[in-house]
């Protein structure tokens, strides 16, 4: 791979913790994906996503210069954000394998607007089970759909609580 191309794509494939990030709040985050990505609506949405021409050119060059290194579906095109949200996505599975650094405090705010027949609630896009992350110091369920979780008064109150706590702990 050309050195300039390697430098360009490296940040997309190699993740390093940022030492100045001390706290993370996940809001309606599908850590384990969403079944909607695998259903008709997700497939239709994925088909409408167009790669920028420069990304397609980079992808084509990498595949051409590394024959047999990619799964057939990745040889054809890069996965879309919808593809990555499929629960069995290899990329999503790899991301789940990354660990949050020990110096980072994590919180989850999870939408829970409905109960499914299987007993797992969710925000109509992300099931609660997908939004849960082991090791968070706080988890709040908000009675809101996915597109409204971020604006819900319970979310705003929880964010304010977390920010005040962070200020107290850091002495800022």
Predicted segments — roles?
Residues 1-172:
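Helical cap/lid subdomain of alpha/beta-hydrolase-fold lipid enzymes
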């Amino acid at each position: 791979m050309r050195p300039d191309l390697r430098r360009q794509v490296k940040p997309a494939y190699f993740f390093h913790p940022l030492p100045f990030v001390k706290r993370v709040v996940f809001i309606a985050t599908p850590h384990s994906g969403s079944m909607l990505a695998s259903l008709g609506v997700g497939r239709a949405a994925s088909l409408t996503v167009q790669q920028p021409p420069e990304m397609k050119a980079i992808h084509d060059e990498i595949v051409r210069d590394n024959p047999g290194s990619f799964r057939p579906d990745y040889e054809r095109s890069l996965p879309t954000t919808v593809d990555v949200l499929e629960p069995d996505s290899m990329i999503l599975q790899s991301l789940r394998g990354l660990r949050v650094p020990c110096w980072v405090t994590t919180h989850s705010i999870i939408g829970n607007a409905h109960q499914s027949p299987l007993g797992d609630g969710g925000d109509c896009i992300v099931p609660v089970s997908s939004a849960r992350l082991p090791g968070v110091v706080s988890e709040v369920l908000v009675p809101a759909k996915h597109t409204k979780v971020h604006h819900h008064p319970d979310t705003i109150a929880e964010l304010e609580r977390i920010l005040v706590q962070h200020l107290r702990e850091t002495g800022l």
